[in-house]
């Protein structure tokens, strides 16, 4: 996949538009966030934040 | 192609891609030699089934499963980054224990109440023994029965089983018929306002009813308003000794009234 196609993807964790990263199931995670997530230990308070953010990959948003 | 949809944690398993072992090795080579992002993407998505299968092991343990998918995915991404092709094993061989480890750590670190390892072990053993005893004798075993099998004091069993209970919100709804829901809070009794106390109050009222006004007033000031004998004496213009005497007589009278 070339980079122009990937442009304008919004990362689920930092909510910023990034061009490098991966799609995890339905959502996009930018390279920087992925690195951060992977190096976070489960006891880190940030971990709970990532888990919360990543929840949207398998729970569709509720529209009212 | 079966039309049956299997959904785990909101993920439709039939839509997940599957990778063959050779494909996976090729992708890993691409990732590790060239740092190819798309290879990693394919590897992550191609192994999501692995995460789901691991989550299912945690399904019937009474733990909170909702967030485990994300945790599993993080575990999967960690294992993809650390996988070493030179060990010549299948990726799943390496990834499954990694994902399980990640989930275990997550559950341990995110429990609202920290329970010591040994206590937790006792509790899990107790639960197993309980299950076994139920299937053998088809009745609920007592804490003593479990304690006898595990050879620990039965207080320990009770304590351990208590410790692994999940805390529950007072506002957790337990029944909802569309109207006002019933919360856990509504079913907790108020220990300060129980029946026996209510009966005592009735008896007290009955006892006081037969006293004369002066005695009633003194008792009210002394015991309901918490005043000292000196204060009461000053207020109604008698000596403290008189208050003491009247009080004693009134209590004696009340005792007689209640117990007769």
Curated annotation (Swiss-Prot), chain A:
Residues holding Zn(2+): 11, 14, 30, 33
Knocked-out gene: effects: Premature expression of sigma-G factor (sigG or spoIIIG) activity during the early stages of forespore development. Spore formation continues normally. However its absence has deleterious effects on strain robustness and is strongly selected against in competitions experiments.
Effect listed in the UniProt record for changing residue 11 to A: No longer inhibits sigma-G
Consequence recorded when altering residue 47 to A: No longer inhibits or interacts with sigma-G
Inducers of expression: During sporulation under control of sigma-F factor.
Protein name, as recorded: Anti-sigma-G factor Gin
One Pfam family in the UniProt entry: Gin
Function (record text): An anti-sigma-G factor, prevents premature activation of sigma-G factor in the forespore; overexpression leads to 1000-fold reduction in spore formation, spore formation stops after engulfment. Overexpression also inhibits sigma-G transcription activation activity. When both Gin and sigma-G are expressed in E.coli Gin inhibits sigma-G, strongly suggesting Gin inhibits by direct physical interaction.
Cofactor: binding comment: Binds 0.5 mol of zinc/mol protein, probably 1 zinc per dimer.
Disulphide-bonded residues: none
Provenance organism: Bacillus subtilis (strain 168)
Oligomer status and interactors: Probably functions as a homodimer. Interacts with sigma-G factor, recognition occurs via the first 71 residues of sigma-G.
Required co-factors: Zn(2+)
Keywords in alphabetical order: Metal-binding, Sporulation, Transcription, Transcription regulation, Zinc
Molecular function terms, GO-annotated: metal ion binding
Effect of residue 33 to A: No longer inhibits or interacts with sigma-G
Curated annotation (Swiss-Prot), chain B:
PROSITE patterns to which the protein is assigned, alphabetical: SIGMA70_1, SIGMA70_2
Motif (Polymerase core binding): 67-80
Domain of life, source organism: Bacteria
Ways its activity is controlled: Activity repressed by anti-sigma-G factor Gin (csfB) and Lon protease during the early stages of forespore development. When both Gin and sigma-G are expressed in E.coli Gin inhibits sigma-G activity, strongly suggesting Gin inhibits by direct physical interaction.
One GO term of the biological process aspect: DNA-templated transcription initiation
InterPro entries: RNA_pol_sigma-70_dom, RNA_pol_sigma-B/F/G, RNA_pol_sigma-G, RNA_pol_sigma70, RNA_pol_sigma70_r2, RNA_pol_sigma70_r3, RNA_pol_sigma70_r4, RNA_pol_sigma_r2
Disulfide bonds: none
Short name of one Pfam family: Sigma70_r4
Oligomer and partners: Interacts with anti-sigma-G factor Gin (csfB).
Protein's name in the database: RNA polymerase sigma-G factor
């Amino acid at each position: 996949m070339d980079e122009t196609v990937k442009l304008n993807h919004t990362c689920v964790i930092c909510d910023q538009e990034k061009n490098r990263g991966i799609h995890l199931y339905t959502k996009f995670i930018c390279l920087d966030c992925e690195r951060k997530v992977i190096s976070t230990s489960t006891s880190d308070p940030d971990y709970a934040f990532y888990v919360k953010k990543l929840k949207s990959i398998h729970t569709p948003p509720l529209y009212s | 192609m079966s039309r049956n949809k299997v959904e785990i944690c909101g993920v439709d398993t039939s839509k997940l891609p599957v990778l063959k072992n050779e494909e996976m090795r090729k992708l890993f080579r691409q990732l590790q030699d060239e740092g190819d992002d798309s290879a990693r993407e394919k590897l992550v998505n191609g192994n999501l089934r692995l995460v789901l299968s691991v989550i299912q092991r945690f399904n019937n343990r009474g733990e909170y499963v909702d967030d485990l998918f994300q945790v599993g995915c993080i575990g999967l991404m960690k294992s993809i980054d650390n996988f070493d092709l030179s060990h010549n094993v299948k990726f799943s061989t390496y990834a499954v224990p990694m994902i399980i480890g990640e989930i275990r750590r997550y559950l341990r670190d995110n429990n609202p109440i920290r329970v010591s390892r040994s206590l937790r072990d006792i509790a899990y053993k107790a639960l197993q023994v309980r299950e076994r005893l139920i299937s053998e004798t088809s009745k609920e075993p007592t804490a003593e029965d479990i304690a006898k099998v595990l050879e620990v004091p039965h207080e320990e069993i009770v304590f351990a089983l208590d410790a692994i209970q999940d805390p529950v919100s007072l506002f957790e709804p337990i029944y909802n018929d569309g109207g006002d829901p019933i919360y856990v809070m509504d079913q907790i009794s108020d220990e300060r306002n129980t029946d026996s106390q209510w009966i005592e109050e009735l008896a007290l009222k009955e006892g006081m009813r037969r006293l004369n006004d002066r005695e009633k007033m003194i008792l009210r000031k002394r015991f309901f308003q918490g005043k000292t004998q000196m204060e009461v004496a000053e207020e109604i213009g008698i000596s403290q000794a008189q208050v003491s005497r009247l009080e004693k007589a009134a209590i004696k009278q009340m005792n007689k009234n209640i117990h007769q």
